[in-house]
């Protein structure tokens, strides 16, 4: 079975557009596709994803687990464990590693809650 060539019909609505207009249309359509995915990524996370982020930041699996557990205990999971580590490092002017280790030991959580305006109660 051979498909009928209907290319000219399918492109009719694009035929009169300039290259610049086509490029603009392409990026608008790409944003429509990607925006919901980005939104899902921003709003939904899991302990596994957060541990994975921390592993890529250089923490061991045990350190990452401790940070994620404490993040969940304080209702800050939606902020992202890696984001919390990064913000504390910036706030305290210390390395990301030092911030993460301190958080895994229970330090700086009051600061994290303050920075992120509290967690989920």
Curated annotation (Swiss-Prot):
Optimum temperature is 37 degrees Celsius for native enzyme. Displays half-maximal activity at 23 degrees Celsius and 49 degrees Celsius. Rapidly inactivated at temperatures above 45 degrees Celsius. Loses more than 35% and 30% of its activity when stored at -20 degrees Celsius for 1 month and at 4 degrees Celsius for 48 hours, respectively. It catalyses: D-ornithine = (2R,4S)-2,4-diaminopentanoate. Keywords: Isomerase. Optimum pH is 9.0 or between 8.5-8.7 (with Tris-HCl buffer). Half-maximal activity is observed at pH 7.4 and 9.7. It is an enzyme of class 5 (isomerase). GO terms for molecular function: cobalamin binding; D-ornithine 4,5-aminomutase activity. Its EC number is 5.4.3.5. Increased activity in the presence of dithiothreitol (DTT) in vitro. Inhibited by 1 mM potassium phosphate and potassium chloride. Inhibited by L-alpha-ornithine, D,L-alpha-lysine, L-beta-lysine (50%-60%), L-alpha-lysine (26%) and by delta-amino-n-valeric acid to a lesser extent. Significant decrease in activity is observed in the presence of 0.2 mM p-chloromercuribenzoate, N-ethylmaleimide and also by 2 mM iodoacetate to a lesser extent but not inhibited by arsenite. InterPro entries: Cbl-dep_enz_cat, Lys-AminoMut_A. It comes from the Bacteria. The role of OraS remains obscure; however, it seems to be required for a correct folding of the OraE subunit. The complex is active only on D-ornithine and 2,4-diaminopentanoic acid and not active on L-ornithine, L-beta-lysine, L-alpha-lysine or D-alpha-lysine. Heterotetramer of 2 alpha (OraS) and 2 beta (OraE) subunits. This is D-ornithine 4,5-aminomutase subunit alpha.
């Amino acid at each position: 079975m051979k498909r009928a060539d209907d290319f000219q019909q399918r492109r009719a609505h694009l035929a009169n557009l300039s290259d610049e207009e086509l490029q603009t249309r392409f990026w608008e359509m790409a944003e429509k596709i990607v925006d919901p995915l980005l939104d899902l990524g921003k709003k939904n996370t899991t302990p596994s994803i957060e541990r994975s982020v921390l592993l890529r930041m250089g923490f061991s699996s045990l350190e990452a687990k401790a940070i994620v557990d404490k993040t969940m205990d304080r209702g800050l999971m939606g902020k992202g464990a890696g984001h919390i580590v990064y913000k504390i490092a910036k706030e305290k002017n210390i390395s990301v590693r030092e911030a993460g280790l301190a958080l895994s030991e229970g330090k700086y959580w009051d600061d994290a809650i303050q920075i992120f305006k509290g967690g989920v109660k």
